[in-house]
């Protein structure tokens, strides 16, 4: 296939009116490498890389933690239709036996061209700090456990790309030292202070789970996890872009503070995404969703009800430059989990995960 005359998003964040060549599901460098010369006229359209959501629990009344193959496939189809072509289903804090079944599901689900591609699993619990548990069930939280993690990853067929860890919990130092070369270790759901967080980053935990949420605020005398992440140029930070979790001023300032290569937009979406107001569930707890805000009975925000593409558009509406928002939803998440050689930009050799939009970033077609 040849996609003609589109405004193609470049690796540097600029647009260039050019043709894009696809052969056997991959982007190639020239028309000479294309056997199927079918043309798709993209005149007047923007051509974006498919989005990469590394932190999402579910959508359309299904949750990864349901351990349901058909439900997971439905989530993947929803995500693909909304411009998310690479996806990390994300678990909650649950008993070990349940987690093993959940991770097996990701290995077993049938995927085709209607689905977002599973590029890894995000293991958000159970190695969290009860003080900052958020919407996770405290009774299932446990100390960092290397063998527990490895059992889960074995059940997942080695697909776990990311694991959240509270570095102030007993056993975290050994966990980071032992596993930081096997999996991306993300600091999150923690009351850790700056010193603790900075030391964890020094040991190899160079990612932060949903910055600002489920951690202490940054103070001028105690900068905490946020300050440690800002100070470490190798640290990537997730940020929920739904317009509910974080104030627009903070969103804009985060991009200024961390630059255009370290912010990873995520949805943190749960099963209410794509649904109407009503009652739903997350991690075994009842959640009320009203006007895209999902909360537990005590008012705690319980994930988002917004897909990543809409999160990206939301942060643009807050004043974040379009190029930075798109990079934060494509290249940056791909880099953060080590898959940028396959996805995240429209570069020859990578998967032809392509989203066509109008000038206002309304989706026209997902390839």
Task: Please place each PLM-identified region on the residue numbering.
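Residue-level marker for buried hydrophobic side chains located in beta-strands
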Residues: 50-52, 186, 263-266, 355
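C-terminal cap of metal-dependent C-N hydrolases
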Residues: 6, 335, 345-367
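Divalent metal-binding pocket/active-site signature
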Residues: 123, 130-146, 150-224
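Di-metal (Zn2+ and/or Mg2+/Mn2+) metal-binding site signature of metallo-dependent hydrolases
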Residues: 45-69
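Histidine-rich, glycine-flanked metal-binding segment
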Residues: 1-48
């Amino acid at each position: 296939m040849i996609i003609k005359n589109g405004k193609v998003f470049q690796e540097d964040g600029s647009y260039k009116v050019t043709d894009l060549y696809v052969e056997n599901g991959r982007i190639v460098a020239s028309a000479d490498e294309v056997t199927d010369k079918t043309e798709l006229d993209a005149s007047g359209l923007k051509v974006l890389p498919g989005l990469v959501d590394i932190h999402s629990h579910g959508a359309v009344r299904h949750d990864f933690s349901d351990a349901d193959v058909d439900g997971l496939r439905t989530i993947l189809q929803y995500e693909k239709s909304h411009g998310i072509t690479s996806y990390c289903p994300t678990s909650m804090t649950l008993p070990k036996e349940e987690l093993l079944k959940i991770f097996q599901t990701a290995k077993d689900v049938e995927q085709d061209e209607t689905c977002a591609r599973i590029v890894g699993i995000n293991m958000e619990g159970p190695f969290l700090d009860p003080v900052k548990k958020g919407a996770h069930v405290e009774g299932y939280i446990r100390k960092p456990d290397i063998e527990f993690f490895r059992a889960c990853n074995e059940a997942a067929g080695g697909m776990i790309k990311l694991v959240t860890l509270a570095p102030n919990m007993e056993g975290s130092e050994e966990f980071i030292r032992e596993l930081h070369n096997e999996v991306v270790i993300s600091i999150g759901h923690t009351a850790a202070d700056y010193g603790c967080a900075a030391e964890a980053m020094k040991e190899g935990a160079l990612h932060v789970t949903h910055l600002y949420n489920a951690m202490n605020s940054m103070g001028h005398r105690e900068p905490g996890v946020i300050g440690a992440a800002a100070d470490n140029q190798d640290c990537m930070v997730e940020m929920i872009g739904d317009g509910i979790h974080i104030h627009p001023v903070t969103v804009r300032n985060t991009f200024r503070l961390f630059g255009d290569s370290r912010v990873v937009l995520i949805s943190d979406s749960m099963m209410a995404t794509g649904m109407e107001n009503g009652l739903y569930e997350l991690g075994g707890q009842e959640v009320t969703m009203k006007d895209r805000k999902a909360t537990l009975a005590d008012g705690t925000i319980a994930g988002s009800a917004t897909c990543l593409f809409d999160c990206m558009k939301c942060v643009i509406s807050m004043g974040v430059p379009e190029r930075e928002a798109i990079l934060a939803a494509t290249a940056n998440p791909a880099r953060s989990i080590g898959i940028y050689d396959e996805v995240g930009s429209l570069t020859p050799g990578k998967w032809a995960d392509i989203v066509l939009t109008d000038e206002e970033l309304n989706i026209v077609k997902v390839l």
